[in-house]
């Protein structure tokens, strides 16, 4: 079961794709009418926007608001994985440590949703062929695996590992 927070273009797309694969979904969105319509369309459970953070599921996928992973909300999480497209999900850097301490696998937002910036950067640099963009996007799952492996091996939160990797990639680490 996947708990999806946000049912706009990103969250709605995630929900439709997962539903097509047979996943059971719990959906929540700020736009209640849109969330209700999508839940009915997909045969998903409708949850309150605040309550979605407490739904027991395999994955919480935040796809709307930033700063939703706070000290209080992390304590209430009932998922082993947090992976979604919302920007700046961690309210503070300390929240990355809190998620790590809870044993929750966290996919840092700027890694999981890097496809957009990859496309823009390659286009800006004049290297934006569809094939090049897709080849770079296909590297994202491997990067996540590297982040999680390093996090596990070093005991360092995935958010910190990802920050270090990003700094190294852009020549600042």
Where are these regions (language model features)?
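Rossmann-like adenosine-cofactor binding region
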Residues: 38-111
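NAD(P)-binding Rossmann-fold cofactor-contacting core
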Residues: 20-42
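Hydrophobic/small residue at the entry helix of a nucleotide-binding pocket
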Residues: 10
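Conserved N-terminal Rossmann-fold NAD(P)-binding element of oxidoreductases
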Residues: 2-6
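Adenosine-phosphate binding glycine-rich loop
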Residues: 80-173
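Rossmann-fold NAD(P)-dependent oxidoreductase module
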Residues: 13, 17-18
